[in-house]
Amino acid sequence: MKVLHIALSDRGGAGAGMLTQHLALLAQGIDSKVLVASKRTDLDSIFQVEPNQYVWGKGKTAQFLQKVARRMGLCLNRYDRYKRRVYKIRRQHWTEFSLPITTYDLSVHPLVEEADIINLHFVADFLDYESFFRKVHKPIVWTMRDENPGLGGFHYSSTKSELYSYFADLEDEFADIKLKALTSCEHLHIVALSQQMRNFCAQSQCFAGRPITIIPNAINADNFRPYRRHEARQHLGIGEDDLTIAFVSCAIEDERKGFRELALAVQQLEAQTSRPINVLCVGANEYNGPVPSNCRFFGHLNTPNDLSAVYSAADVFAAPSHQESFGKTVVEALCCGTPVVSTPVGIAPEIINERNGALYRIGDVDDLARALHDVFNRTYDKESIRREAREHFLPQSVAKQYIKLYEYVLASATSH
């Protein structure tokens, strides 16, 4: 069985989830390969698509005319026209908003042609829906890394609710393009990373009537392991008796990640205690809102060891996101034995309980402060927290679930 994963990149949150799944399948003896637009690893089983595989204009003359037109501010094709409209609005209302049409024609790639089954992942701004689903008739499994495939250009329904009026025409046009393209896909099986994502997919018009299976992200617990608390704190320069919260996000200023609410909740707690409260923040930082007095920004930490040190130094990991497809940082923290305070999004409501943390209401600063206070004042069995998380998200377990699904989808496609 030849499996081809298609993803925008092998890095980032979605890319890391795909990569762990791919490596776990290889470990199970599956012929698994990956096709990406941007390759950041040096793995031989991952291939970057050639930039000249366009839907239109493969010839040198067409490419030259396209380059000249762009310099003159002209749009020769629908992709450029849509791109200009999107960027014009995004300059005023920044958010992730992706086109369902691209300049790639992945249907003609040799890896696509040789695959028995294709597993799509995060493919925004890479997959051209119209050409791909019209030309590719192989069985497809689609792992939902966010909600974009079931929307128009938005990546999360919460953002759509907030900004729809500014993107209304484009959102509706893009959703219609996706819906029409997907009608050509005969053998499509959806994989949701959590029950919440399954509910979204079941309600999306794009996936009406499609089979959906829940398979969580694989997390390599050997990469995320607890450090001795005092050693981690000593390494980071944190007092042994300080109250410490960890927060991780690709972009700290992303309002969907909820750092503003965390900062306000910590300010409440600081007024209630004489003990210092440290907030350890990991991720790109262009945030300019309220900041706790003892807040340290580490930028991006590229190795699991560095992240594990931050998780292990914290008394609690805070996950105040408004929406998540999965929430892998929650699982990473648990794998380090650190209790979690989280909103009930992604995988959190399925795994967070009184033994490993607490849930609180989305956007409720007072409730977040209460939950953090409660966790600070409880004792947790860190080894038990780690063991439960490790067992639930083992890569080999997740790989076996995918293999079983691939076999089922292939058999179903053959019987039709």
Give the residues covered by each predicted segment.
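Conserved donor-binding/catalytic core segment of Leloir-type glycosyltransferases
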Residues: 186, 191, 239-257, 263-266
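Nucleotide-activated donor-binding/catalytic signature segment of Leloir-type glycosyltransferases, i.e.
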Residues: 283-305
